Regions:
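Membrane-embedded alpha-helical bundles of multi-pass transporters/translocases
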Residues: 2-230, 234-317
Length: 317
């Protein structure tokens, strides 16, 4: 896995068309939690409603708190061998299949089982959030111009959308296949493991694609040493805090709140879907059609959104 010193010029064909395969795997993986976690806790593991509330609240609060520090962690920690961000595409993703599958392992419906699954939820999210942030950061590193960054972002969104569409059929089908082989109790853990492995493989593909685009750990340390010496001569530059950035750009706060609202509705509707089709409509097979239609409409809405935004901006100017 050693990197040579040759720096690629422009975006490679693999980056242009396959930047996002890891995000496709990430979408497949995370949707197992979105659609089946609550069902597993209540119907398979048979935890009480109070226990589920405590488990999910603890894991969600810790995840929210830690999410505020992942970026700072990556920026402050000593860069690893293959680069500050690129290295994390292979350092922790391989842990995710094991940690994530543990979230869907039934031990007991008592305290021990609740603690085991809660720890699995917390640790699995740490293991996948760090490479997720590093993966997004690599867009600004690999893309040297605004056009290149837009192309990488577009490719990533295409693969993410592709993941949501294929999950509509692959997700429920994988659970059904593993249920027939391993039983329903173990089907969700097996599906989580396989989809997490696909995510890890996709991130490894990103690692290979971005070879040469980011300076290695040794190269960055040399550069930082030179910059530190230059700062001593020229004086310290002014630093802008996160709160200062929000104060200068208040629209960022509204964007943040709108995204939170969007995901609250998304997770609530998707999480309740399996209950509706199982107990209300009495036809669980309809879940596949619902997922396909919802994900397809989300792609159409995302495509139309850029035209709506452009029209609104045109009216303002």
């Amino acid at each position: 896995m050693s990197d040579n010193n040759t720096k690629p010029k422009g975006l490679s064909k693999s980056l242009k068309y396959f930047c996002g395969v890891g995000d496709c795997g990430f979408t497949l993986m995370s949707n197992i939690d979105t659609f089946y976690a609550s069902y597993f806790f209540t119907n398979i593991a048979r935890f009480s409603l109070g226990a589920i509330t405590v488990m999910t609240t603890i894991s969600a609060v810790i995840d929210a708190i830690l999410s505020c520090f992942y970026g700072a962690f990556l920026n402050k920690i000593k860069p690893k061998k293959w680069g500050r961000y690129r290295s994390w595409l292979i350092l922790t993703p391989w842990l995710v299949p094991f940690l994530y599958a543990m979230q869907f392992v039934k031990i007991t419906n008592g305290l021990a089982g609740a603690i085991f699954i809660t720890l699995a939820m917390i640790t699995s999210r740490i293991a996948w959030n760090i490479p997720y942030i590093a993966n997004v950061s690599m867009i600004n590193i690999a893309g040297k111009t605004q056009e290149e960054r837009m192309q990488l972002s577009s490719s990533r969104m295409v693969w993410t959308s592709f993941g949501t569409v294929i999950y509509s059929y692959v997700g429920p089908a994988a659970v059904a296949v593993f249920a027939g082989i391993l039983g329903e109790t173990n089907a969700y853990a097996a599906t989580a493991f396989v989809f997490s492995a696909l995510m890890a493989a996709g991130y490894y593909a990103h690692f290979r694609m971005t070879k040469g685009y980011e300076e290695t750990g040794a190269e960055e340390m040399e550069r930082l040493a030179r910059e530190a010496a230059a700062k001593k001569k020229g004086g310290e530059s002014q630093k802008i805090s996160t709160f200062g950035a929000v104060k200068c750009n208040p629209h960022l706060l509204f964007l943040f709140l709108s995204n939170i609202s969007k995901y609250i509705v998304l997770f609530m509707v998707n999480g309740l879907a399996i209950y509706y089709f199982t107990y209300v409509s009495k036809n669980p097979d309809l879940l596949t059609g619902f997922l396909f239609a919802a994900n397809l409409l989300s792609i159409v809405a995302s495509y139309c959104a850029k035209f709506i935004v452009a029209k609104i901006n045109a009216k303002r100017t």
